[in-house]
Amino acid sequence: ITTNNFMAVDQAKRDIIALYEEDFGKIDDSGRAKALYDAIPAQLSRNAMRYQVGKAIEEERVSRIMNVVKEMEDSMTVNVVYHSDDPNTGLALTKNEDYFKMYTSDTGLFVTLAFKDNKITENIIYDKLLNDKLSTNLGYVYENVIAQVLRATGKNLFYHTIPYAEGKKYYEIDFVIPDRHKISP
């Protein structure tokens, strides 16, 4: 930070991600946890209704990896947001574990994951990101920030989808949180 060199910061974040991935091997030695984590930016940028496990791990299904997702959530490296089929004050009553979204618990690491295909993320990328000049939709970065902040305040996170009149597309409420005797979108 004192050098204003984001590349040095990026390398430190890559080292942290490597440690996470090493720990994911302890959770699941098949590599599924690592694959799920690495796919978070791609999953969110698709703007899909849920985390599509089969796109992150070929021929895998939610039912077979749910224990891995729970372990990742318990490790506090990810924030998992579950679909609430009927959002009332008892959101957990209609929690649908087959439909979830996954966010990183650290948005800085999320940004590095998004550019992980390069050996290092150049200062110019961080400069453009900080000055809102990056030519990409950053909505998913902001979504990750909100998930991180809400979880840091102790909120349990849910989301809800509502079909359009035609039923083929959905409106989505990204975060539905219980707030005493009511819910807040």
Language model: regions and residue ranges:
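Accessory nucleic acid-recognition modules appended to NTPase machines
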Residues: T2-I177, H181-K182
